[in-house]
A protein has these predicted regions:
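Basic, Lys/Arg-enriched alpha-helical interface segments
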Residues: 1-37, 52-54, 62, 67-87
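Short, surface-exposed coil-to-beta transition loops
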Residues: 39-44
Length: 87
């Protein structure tokens, strides 16, 4: 699945990703890299600004390097989402 296909799918269903607890509206979704299988998937953190129908890609990481965001990372991204929402 190419990144362009991933973007198209997310545009069709921008609330597909799971809401991150205490994340201020940020979401996490898994994206499989081409020819890598499940072990080659990455997690993408994004924010969907409903009023303007804009999706901001905020952060990406491989599951093999990190299981979840730390509390401090969530706090930083929550602050960013708040700023983006107020634009």
């Amino acid at each position: 699945e190419s990144y362009k296909d991933f973007q198209r799918q997310l545009l069709l269903n921008p609330e597909k990703g799971d809401l991150i607890k205490d994340g201020g509206g940020i979401r996490k979704i898994r994206w499989n890299l081409e020819n890598k299988g499940k072990s080659g998937s990455i997690r993408i953190i994004y924010f969907y600004k409903i009023q303007k129908e804009i999706i901001y890609m905020l952060y990406a990481y491989t599951k093999s390097n990190k299981a979840n965001l730390s509390d401090s990372e969530t706090k930083i991204l929550r602050t960013l989402a708040k700023e983006l929402n107020n634009e």
